[in-house]
Amino acid sequence: MKQSFETSKLYYGFPIFILGYQDQTHGYNVTTCSSSYSLGDWLVIGVGSEENAADQIKHYQKFTVNIPDESLMLEMEQAGFISHREKIAKFGLDFQPSKLTQAPILDACPVVLDCQVDRIIEEDGICHIFAKILDRLAESDLLDDRGHFKNDRFAPTYFMGDGYKRVYRYLDDRVDPMGSFIKKARKKDDKSSITT
């Protein structure tokens, strides 16, 4: 039986990413985020209104979503815990400025989304940033010979927890194609209708 529980927040599993942006003081900068969703060519991210990233993205209207794997956990944590300072050089992160947005594309992150801000809605201390995805970039070993993404090869880290404790969750290489459970159920139903 389910029961109600009190918590100030609940993160039920969101991929962690390193938000890259131009910075008026430091040239380029990064911070860690986990609040996002994507539909088609749209991406929505959430950042605290008081954060340097919010100010810089409001100014430049562009950013990158650099999605690390677990090999970059130290840098990912550092980028989130240290604020209002230059972090790219401090952590030794190699990057290239995007040709489309000039926001930093981190070499160590296997998947990157290059984004242009469409609008920002600020409410309750959070900037909800709606952006168009201008480009999707992936390491070549994550793409098959037809340029399709190899889902079983990419394992982003997920952020989960509540007001009491927050943790990182890791993916394994199991994948099931969308619709495969319905197909299995139909086959099972077909077999049972033949035998009855």
What are these regions (language model features)?
Residues 1-196:
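Basic, polyanion-binding surface patches
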